[in-house]
Amino acid sequence: MQWKLVLGCVSAAFLAMAGSAFAQQASTPPYGPAITLDDAKRAMSAAELEAAKNAWQVAITILDSGGNLVMFHKMDNTQLASITASEGKARTALTFKRPSKALDDAIAAGGAGLRLLAVKDITPLEGGLPILVDGKIVGAIGVSGALSSQDAQTAKAGADAVAK
């Protein structure tokens, strides 16, 4: 009987640790007004420049704070799967108010993080970031086509171009 209690405590501790990889942040930024077209163009240009200077062929998606498509670019010779992946990464970052890599990490950690796989229409891969202006989420950018870390680097260049 006592071993069941110990096993239960160990299991609970393991699940708590695995779930902490994706614990709700104490304070996530609120949603703000939709990203302006000028800011979206600035983010897109910066992301495209980052990808081009590194010879990465990527697809780049920018959504507004309501999840609506504002801009999309597919660079020459980008694999077709990157079209939907870039939008999925942006949508994931927007709906979870955090980089899409946070979900990637939570799932990779296993345990309770695997529950994220049950969430419909997420793309838990690195390369999606919320776009913040004045501390509010005005949209998100998603990039796909290179290595995930390179996608994230490209997305960061775009998000940083409009961050205030």
Residue ranges and their predicted role:
Residues 1-8:
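Bacterial Sec-dependent N-terminal signal peptides
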Residues 8-20:
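Bacterial N-terminal signal peptides
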Residues 22-164:
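Flexible, solvent-exposed loop/hinge segments and secondary-structure transition points
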